[in-house]
Amino acid sequence: MPVPKRHPARQKYRLLELTRIAKKLNLPINKQPKFFPPKDPHLPAKFVIASNKMGNKLSFGNECLKYLWSLEKDISDFNILEEICEKLSLNFEEIKKIALNDEIKKEYQQNSEDAIKNDVFGAPSYVFNNEIFWGQDRLDYLEEALKK
């Protein structure tokens, strides 16, 4: 359910959790960023997939989160995506070409279908050995599962 449609108590708790997370991780977070949710959440997601294909496993996605939650930038804007590429010394035109091609569209669609098949209901979610781990506060459980 989109954040604005959640029960007011749930919305209030979400803001409290964001404060806790920011403090625990020492991250600057704008709890109500101007551009959340992004106008087009699919575009930055496709750029993340493209950057992964180019060998940037986490940096592009991490920068997108920083730009959205800390810098209050619209990550569905090509100019902002280009700014992120420049910061990471990535070729924007190359990533853009990859992000907008049919292969990435198919992979993005497959990721969505896989999420539905695995009963993913929110982000962040991780599926390992057919078991779902939901929420940043469950990463320790995922870590334990990975060690087995």
Label every PLM stretch briefly.
Residues 63-148:
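C-terminal cap of thioredoxin/glutaredoxin-like
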Residues 1-68:
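Structural alpha/beta surface segment adjacent to cysteine/selenocysteine redox centers
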